[in-house]
């Protein structure tokens, strides 16, 4: 138990990002890391625009650049190439992320998605209403400025002023910004686009149908999607719609899916073949097998997201944040109702809209907050959502002419500073007054191992403990049996291995029945023998199959089938599922080393290192 306690203390200091699934962890790390570059680009733009070289700043972004092919050419100034060209790539990546969330992420579960969706809608409606109520006259047209949230700045600010452990809050806020981005791009298309060209819109429709067909047909190579998106972007620019529409719609049409068992096993076979015969053709086959196993959506995200976060968004800030505040411009902005309409709508509107919509949704029973996230965290995240920046600057450039655009930009910059300070104050108050500190999944095994109730392999007093939450129909759990066997051979009597049931009934229809069968076999002292058989025959888990395995093991088949249907057997499985929820195990296999949830790879070498570390 002392080793478990020390392991828990060390685990509490680990990087929280390691607790996330790989795609979400990659997304968060890239966005949070780019926040520093974004801040630097903003500062550089302001310094440049207010220096003796301010003329060169204006000249740079007004310089013309063209792409010509035969008689066709597309000409824009550099500012528009950034706003209409590179930012379309940014919104394409956002569209990819939205599609992934709806297909395999947080938005697949209506109960889990309900509160973030309500929060996002509140965070859109309340700021817009506040802005319209405050803004003078024709400036009310710019209400779209206050609806967006800058994901990079939001996550960067959360890392600085938010809870130390905030995994679940980050995912919640990321889901909110996904809805935010969908609405923001829709608003740009509906309210801030130029006169429209019906012929070009027809060409857009052709490319959209083409992209939908590519996804429908399961085309796994990225090149056809890239070419279709390029054609869609050109048609959108010619149509008069803002190019961000092309990016978002294109991303939404690229299918996302989890790797199938067949694809993963096929890739593994090809890599084994490459190890045995490392020539060029076999290596190419192995590489293609891996590409086929991972959805084109995630491959495009992995390739493009660093570019948009570390290059496109900072370049956008450099091109758009440079407001010349000299000659009374700053004073005029501070005296303008437009400026303060932006500030109040972003700082107070986002806080109230996201926070109150979440409270209403929870109390109405429409959904629940993610485990570990409480309302104080939601209000703090709502405050930080007032950092509108990227989308706000983009819409300000579309909605206003020069003087009003400068005032709106000043308001956006002031709001970013105030929203960060308000977020810190809300998080601090929630921690001090309500005890709402961490906002992440539980990390410690709950309840601890009890040999009287758990399925235990090894000495009860062994110095090392490895607990696995598994599903008998999960192919990844089946492969993990080889890992646990290797670990038991390596550590011998020093290792106690525990198996707990976590049947994922939504995706594995026979998993719960198989778990009950294993418990029924345990009543006759043959749990581990049936455990091994079930993983060897994952495709054959009907009642007749289970009875056959029981007979092969020499069990009393009648007693086995009777126990299979007993409430006590089902309760035993449900207790393990409840302990998985209490321990923060959301998928299979999930391992606990020394009572602490293991994050990252679960190959034999990685788990062996973690077990050795838990000794001291």
From Swiss-Prot:
It is a multi-pass membrane protein. GO terms for biological process: regulation of pH. It holds the Pfam family Na_H_antiport_1. Keywords: Antiport, Cell membrane, Ion transport, Membrane, Sodium, Sodium transport, Transmembrane, Transmembrane helix, Transport. The chain crosses the membrane at residues 28-48, 78-98, 114-134, 142-162, 171-191, 200-220, 226-246, 303-323, 342-362, 378-398, 412-432. Its main location: membrane. It is found in: Cell membrane. It catalyses: Na(+)(in) + 2 H(+)(out) = Na(+)(out) + 2 H(+)(in). InterPro entries: Na/H_antiporter_dom_sf, NhaA, Thioredoxin-like_fold, Thioredoxin-like_sf, Thioredoxin_domain. Residues 435-616 form the Thioredoxin domain. Residues 1-434 are annotated as: Na(+)/H(+) antiporter NhaA. One of its GO terms (molecular function) is sodium:proton antiporter activity. GO terms for cellular component: plasma membrane. Na(+)/H(+) antiporter that extrudes sodium in exchange for external protons. In the N-terminal section; belongs to the NhaA Na(+)/H(+) (TC 2.A.33) antiporter family. PANTHER family: NA(+)_H(+) ANTIPORTER NHAA, SODIUM ION/PROTON ANTIPORTER NHAA-RELATED. This is Na(+)/H(+) antiporter NhaA 2.
């Amino acid at each position: 138990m002392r080793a478990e306690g020390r392991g828990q203390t060390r685990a509490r200091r680990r990087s929280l990002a390691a607790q996330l699934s790989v795609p979400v962890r990659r997304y968060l790390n890239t966005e949070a890391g780019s926040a520093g570059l974004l801040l630097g680009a903003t500062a550089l733009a302001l310094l440049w625009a207010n220096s003796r070289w301010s003329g060169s700043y204006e000249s740079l972004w007004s310089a013309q650049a063209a792409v010509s092919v035969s008689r066709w050419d597309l000409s824009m100034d550099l500012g528009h190439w950034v706003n209409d060209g590179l930012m379309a790539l940014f919104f394409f990546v956002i569209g990819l992320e939205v599609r992934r969330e709806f297909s395999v992420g947080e938005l697949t579960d209506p109960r889990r998605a309900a509160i973030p969706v309500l929060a996002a809608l509140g965070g859109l409606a309340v700021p817009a209403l506040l802005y319209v109520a405050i803004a003078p006259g024709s400036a009310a047209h710019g209400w779209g400025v206050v609806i967006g949230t800058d994901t990079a700045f939001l996550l960067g600010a959360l890392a600085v002023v938010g809870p130390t452990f905030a995994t679940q809050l980050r995912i919640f806020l990321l889901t909110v910004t996904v809805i935010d981005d969908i609405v923001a791009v829709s608003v740009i298309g509906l309210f801030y686009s130029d006169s429209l060209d019906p012929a070009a819109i027809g060409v857009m429709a052709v490319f959209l149908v083409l992209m939908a067909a590519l996804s429908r047909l399961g085309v796994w190579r990225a090149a056809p999607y890239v070419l279709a998106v390029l054609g869609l972007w050109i048609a959108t620019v010619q149509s008069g719609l803002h190019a961000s529409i092309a990016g978002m719609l294109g991303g939404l049409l690229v299918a996302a899916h989890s790797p199938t068992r067949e694809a993963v096993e096929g890739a593994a076979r090809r890599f084994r073949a490459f190890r045995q015969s490392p020539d060029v053709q076999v290596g190419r086959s192995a590489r293609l097998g891996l590409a086929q196993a991972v959805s084109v959506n995630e491959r495009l995200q992995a390739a493009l997201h660093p570019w948009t976060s570390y290059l496109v968004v900072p370049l956008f800030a450099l091109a758009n944040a440079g407001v010349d505040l000299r000659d009374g411009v700053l004073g005029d902005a501070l005296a303008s109702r437009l400026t303060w309409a932006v500030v109040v709508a972003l700082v107070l509107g986002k806080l109230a809209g996201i926070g109150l919509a979440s409270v209403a949704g929870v109390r109405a029973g429409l959904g629940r907050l993610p485990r570990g996230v409480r309302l104080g965290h939601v209000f703090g995240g709502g405050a930080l959502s007032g950092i509108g920046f990227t989308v706000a600057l983009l819409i300000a450039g579309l909605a206003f002419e020069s003087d009003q655009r400068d005032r709106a930009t000043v308001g956006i910059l002031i709001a970013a500073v105030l929203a960060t300070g308000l977020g810190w104050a809300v998080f601090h108050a929630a921690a001090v007054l309500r005890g709402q500190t961490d906002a992440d999944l539980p990390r410690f095994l709950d309840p601890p191992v009890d040999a009287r109730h758990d399925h235990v392999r090894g000495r009860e007093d062994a110095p090392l403990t490895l607990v696995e939450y598994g599903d008998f129909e999960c192919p990844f759990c089946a492969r993990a049996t080889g890992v646990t066997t290797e670990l038991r051979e390596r550590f011998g009597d020093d290792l106690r291995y525990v198996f707990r049931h976590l049947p994922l009934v939504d995706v594995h229809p026979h998993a719960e029945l198989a778990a009950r069968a294993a418990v029924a076999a345990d009543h006759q002292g043959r749990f581990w023998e049936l455990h091994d058989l079930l993983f060897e025959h994952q495709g054959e888990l009907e009642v007749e199959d289970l009875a056959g395995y029981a007979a092969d093991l020499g069990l009393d088949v009648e007693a086995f089938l009777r126990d299979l249907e007993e409430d006590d057997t089902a309760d035993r499985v449900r207790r393990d599922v409840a302990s998985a929820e209490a321990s923060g195990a959301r998928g299979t296999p999930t391992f606990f080393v020394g009572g602490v949830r293991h994050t990252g790879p679960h190959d034999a070498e990685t788990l062996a290192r973690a077990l050795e570390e838990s000794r001291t």
